[in-house]
């Protein structure tokens, strides 16, 4: 008898097979005398579409809504049906005794496996492999601690409830809005509140009125003393009167106080923090960061599980620190890492906290030492950030003296504050940090002369527009960005992790860009006309982050066995009926403000121009037509004059590449330029691959052919 191991992806299945010495490669699985390991390809089974319940529902009609099946159906995904048949045969194989679920350790990973098992009709016992890294050592250790699969039943019920609720609400709200207003409009319990977040910030900026205020400082022996006051002076004359009082008056040092202080490193990275920092440092979007992180985790095996919301480690990981530090010796931080190898770490350190780790701990390096030359430029940047944060967390605190000098002049108090670094601690890892010395020349009781007075004018500034990094953080903590009627709602949002999950937020932002609900201009995310109209047309409940937080709260209760999934689904059905009725009875109108005179080549209706993340495209206004064509898009081809990225207009032989500097060239010229700078022939297919790549050519099968290009 054998154990069947079900992984989520082929790469993880290979890692498990390697760790357990399962060496016989079959068609769709690996095998030895004890184990069979196979894989899903993400989801192999999904919720049925409305037309799979009733073929008459293929056409979208408002009168057919709401669509609420009595029992939810699942179907095998067509493009991966071959692998499903392989997995099904293995599950039903009489040689298989138990099944070990080895999909991603989390709600969605559980759903991937259980939908397959339910579709097959599995009756065999289940075990659960729960891992946070796919290194050989981690896999072998986790196989010694397999859990009874029944312990994760509630996790599955929560995942299934989430999936079914999103289907019921999303399908009906989207079809209702689209058919009511004859436009491609989409609603969702996560995406719509996210549009509202962006819109709220945009309104705050538009309504902001700057105010002028003034500050006063004195210069004494080259040091600037600030007027000590909690008041913001909006009347310049008040400060001018103080300056007049100070003329020909000496000051007296009232006190010189020194307080020794410590500062501590930032928390270890969770996914959201890492995505935010990658955007802040390198302008790399959340989706791209997650994809790169997934590569570091699955392919290179140098970091732990990416989709985590925790900033902490569990206490049983203390003894693994030395191996992880040794792995970082391959990086530019080796000089800072070396002293830490001999250090003894304690579970009492602040980074270790079992109560603050749920499914997965913070993102840190594994014990696998990377081959730095194998990492792409983006992978290097990301890995370096993780290593930097990890090493900082293990280093001593930064220590400094906070010096406060108080000056009294004509009854007014002025203050000088300076920090003097005494111990670099974790800041030694940062370039430019050093021990500082302040030779402040003041002693208590000194009489001093004022060499200069300075009245400075300031202006209040509006909040900043969200960018892709800060929007992620806002989705995680929406209570900090919206007004709520009751403080308990803010607590609900905080406890449930806000809008979406750490694993889905990047996809949601990407989806909103693609559906033209939001756009980014110079890194500033704004709501489009379409996005604003969606908010106006959508039921108010669906625009609030509070609703999704309340749902998430119930899903967490289901996960803990404290709420019935059936009750939750019934609530969602009732909510959906109200949403559909509200849309049906609405007298509002939707206006296409981006309608063009270009006819759709498929149905003849006029097309609408929409902005995408990387350019513009024309989309048929008829939701059932789905015809699209690119108008322009950014490429990775470089201008030969200014080296900026070129924008592609048109397609095929008529395509033209243009640059902001004024340079332009035809497709034929671009092909010729590539060939002249390459050692070999470059096909149109290869050219297209090059244009579509988000990163360099490191992992491109045409790397050798294109390595001499200077585009």
Swiss-Prot record:
One matching Pfam family: Toprim
Domain Toprim: start-end pairs: 2-135
Originating gene: topB
First-tier enzyme category under EC: isomerase
Record's protein name: Putative DNA topoisomerase 3
Organism annotation: Staphylococcus aureus (strain bovine RF122 / ET3-1)
Keyword DNA-binding: yes
Keywords annotated in UniProt: DNA-binding, Isomerase, Magnesium, Metal-binding, Topoisomerase
Active site: 305
Catalytic activity: ATP-independent breakage of single-stranded DNA, followed by passage and rejoining
Tree of life domain: Bacteria
Biological process annotations from GO: DNA recombination; DNA repair; DNA topological change
